[in-house]
């Protein structure tokens, strides 16, 4: 399985059950609190990652937009060296994300036509090794095998974000101490 979502066929229908819909409706009562927590987490990531060369935290691009801060993502400069990157795609991917409920699928090869940069995968694996779950940004739809023959209108931005981006933990249970630990492990993974 790959550490990013790879869609090779169409045919799954993951509709929300009535129970999940009820849980979702109940979550609406704490939505503002969750968004405030995510916003606080983003601010903490911003403060703790300030000055880390080669890593940029994605922020709200303009006051004209209002982010829900669902994901806190970083971009790794391609020239940033991360420990272990030289061997990162030589073995089967560990800690890969799966489909519904974490179900993983067997990968036919170690590589696909498009995958995150070596330093991004090395950082994901370094974080995974210390119990921190992260994942690459979503693979662009036009790069998914299932859509390879479809028309596309692209400018390179989605490919660049996919190759350089990493999603960091930011859920409602992530504490300030967790963020400090995550950032410290990010710093530990960077070659000096």
Regions found by a protein language model. Give the residues of each.
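PLP-dependent aminotransferase class I/II
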Residues: 1-192
């Amino acid at each position: 399985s790959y550490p990013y979502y790879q869609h090779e066929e169409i045919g799954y229908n993951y509709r929300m059950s009535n129970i999940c819909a009820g849980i979702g409706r109940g979550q609406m009562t704490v939505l503002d609190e969750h968004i405030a927590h995510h916003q606080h987490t983003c601010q903490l990531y911003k403060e703790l990652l300030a000055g880390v060369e080669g890593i940029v935290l994605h922020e709200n691009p303009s006051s004209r937009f209002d982010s829900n801060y669902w994901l806190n993502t970083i971009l790794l400069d391609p020239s940033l060296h991360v420990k272990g990157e030289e061997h990162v795609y030589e073995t089967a991917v560990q800690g890969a994300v799966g489909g519904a409920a974490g179900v993983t699928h067997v990968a036919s090869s170690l590589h696909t036509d498009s995958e995150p940069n070596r330093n991004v995968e090395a950082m994901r694996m370094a974080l995974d090794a210390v119990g921190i779950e992260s994942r690459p940004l979503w693979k662009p739809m036009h790069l998914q095998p299932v859509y390879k023959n479809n028309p596309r209108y692209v400018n390179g931005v989605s490919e660049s974000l996919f190759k350089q981006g990493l999603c960091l933990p930011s859920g409602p249970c992530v504490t300030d101490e967790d963020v400090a630990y995550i950032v410290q492990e990010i710093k530990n993974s960077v070659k000096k």
